């Protein structure tokens, strides 16, 4: 938190709600919410660059569950038909709806702590298994979900499909 400003500015998104309870209104640095231009100086390591990214191309698919599952299945099927190795990041609630590719449930949606804890391990696992393409479900951005989505967005290089 930078204390010399009139309004506090959070550069670590996972603590926004906790900070608001303590200090009142807190802004979120734009680098947390999306890609920043090359001329912007990052305020903290990892705010500007793609990091903790898998070797595979990662696409984040956001929207209503039905549309997300349908889109991921279609995209994964296309890549599998080309002979590519495909990974899918899903949740406990949707894992039975993906018949194709390497599948990793990151946890239950209601357990954001578990999802956050499993994220990097799942990405590294896909690297170890040789995935060339990874498709991930998006997550709600409330509470810890904002940090999860920030990490996924950066890992995907902001390659996001909204369906």
Region spans (language model):
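A C-terminal functional module that forms or caps the active site or interfaces directly
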Residues: 40-157
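Single conserved hydrophobic/aromatic residue that forms the stacking wall/gate
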Residues: 1-11
